Amino acid sequence: AHLGVCVANAIYAITCPGTAARAAGETTSWFIDFGMRNFFQNAELGISNALSGVVYHRELVFFVLCAALFFGVWSKYRTWIYRLLGLFPVTCVFLLGVLDQPLTQMIPKLSFFVNGLTDKGTVTVVTAWSLKRYLPFLLLCAVFAVCIIDLYLALGHTVQAWMAGVVLCGGFASRAMLGFSPTVWQSGDRTAFFFLMGCLFVTLCVWQTLSDAPKRFRLGLIALVGVCAVSTTLSLIGA
């Protein structure tokens, strides 16, 4: 019954005349070209907006999630292909996100990934015919897809794994769907909160599985969280 009420409310919110009037006003105020975009352009913008902020920028909550998945996979598997899958997201996020500024100063060509997102998306009408321009978007998709695979590997074929996957994908979708709204650049911070809360929940789920893992994996994750906490505190106080 509760689900039915939610669905009915969503249908009403989408179809009521006030929604169309508000969308027209927001398009004029925030995204004048929004009405000229197609489904695929909006989907690409939403995905790029949701993931660029956590992969190509210094978002420690998502980095800790990737690190937890790394420890979770490496504590359970010795097969090299599984370990490579566990290593891929945390490496990408560490190099392109956590170390974005110092690394791009050392290797300027990496700024192609970090600065790939524009206000029209990663792939625009102007750059659509350049295969190189698709690389930042494809890397974002690959990182998130491998995170889902790592989550399944770390938690196993369990109900908890499916629940954690739904929470993570739901948090991601709550921000990616803004690609279909003219306020995509004004409402991003609010919806990012739900995505990051989903990341924290999934991190806790993976942490529980490390209780049976060798002690070095738990200590490694604790040390990493401590370093991230100190780093965040220092940045907040301007040290």
Q: For the regions a protein language model found, what residue spans apply to each?
A:
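Transmembrane alpha-helical segments
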Residues: 222-239
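Membrane-interface junctions at the ends of membrane-embedded or membrane-associated helices
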Residues: 75-76, 148-161, 203-222
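Transmembrane catalytic cores of multi-pass membrane glycosyltransferases
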Residues: 1-154, 161-165, 171-190, 235-239
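Residues within membrane-spanning alpha-helices of integral membrane proteins
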Residues: 3, 164, 168, 199-202, ...
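Alpha-helical transmembrane segments of multi-pass membrane proteins
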Residues: 141-145, 193-204
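Polar low-complexity intrinsically disordered regions
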Residues: 3-7, 11, 212-216, 223
